[in-house]
Regions:
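Classical nucleotidyltransferase
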Residues: 1-66, 147-156, 164
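Phosphate/ribose-recognition catalytic cores of enzymes acting on nucleotide-derived substrates
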Residues: 12-15, 56-173
Length: 173
């Protein structure tokens, strides 16, 4: 009922044609599945993670896709499913397009450690220790293991193109 009241107040349409009640359990399930775009429609806003940029292993930089590694400030914040996402990256009052990976980086042999790392498209400055917000738009694919770094690089180029297409269509407000 709270979600419906907020939707009414903010002039957001909730499609109840499937007779599925919108609940916090449903939102959590959608996020665990990586369905961030559907979760956003249910919430009435895009899901986001806030955190601080921390040092990583510099692997992304070495293969032409430098990443900002996020340490999430809220330990109780739900991290969506592993995979690649089109996101908005906001810091210092500016918003940029980002290609986000959540997962264990299986091609790099990261072990069991789950990371949250974003390649900020067309951006080449140092942002270590900066507070950033990642706003999820759409999951583009699950995290996959490739047979070689070259195959990974080829896929990352495709991912970057798809991310730009999605974000240009989304037109950040």
């Amino acid at each position: 009922d709270v979600i419906r009241a907020q939707a009414y107040t903010n002039d957001i349409r909730i499609d109840a044609s499937q007779s599925v009640p919108v609940s916090s359990s449903l939102i959590r399930k959608l996020l665990h599945q990586g369905d961030v775009d559907i979760a956003a429609r249910c919430l009435g806003y895009e899901y986001f993670l806030d955190g601080t940029v921390v040092g990583g292993y510099q692997v992304g930089r070495k293969i032409g896709f430098p990443t900002a590694n996020l340490s999430v400030d809220d330990p109780d914040k739900l991290i969506p499913a592993d995979g690649v996402y089109a996101v908005w990256v906001t810091f210092d009052g500016k918003t940029y397009m980002g290609m986000l990976n959540i997962g264990v980086r299986p091609t790099i042999n990261n072990g069991p450690n789950r990371t949250i790392e974003v390649n900020i498209l067309h951006f080449h400055s140092d942002i270590y220790d900066k507070f950033i917000r990642l706003t999820f738009v759409k999951r583009t694919r699950p995290e996959l293991k490739y047979d070689s770094i070259d195959q990974l690089i080829t896929q990352l180029h495709k991912d970057a193109e798809e991310t730009e297409t999605i974000l240009f269509a989304a037109k950040r407000r």
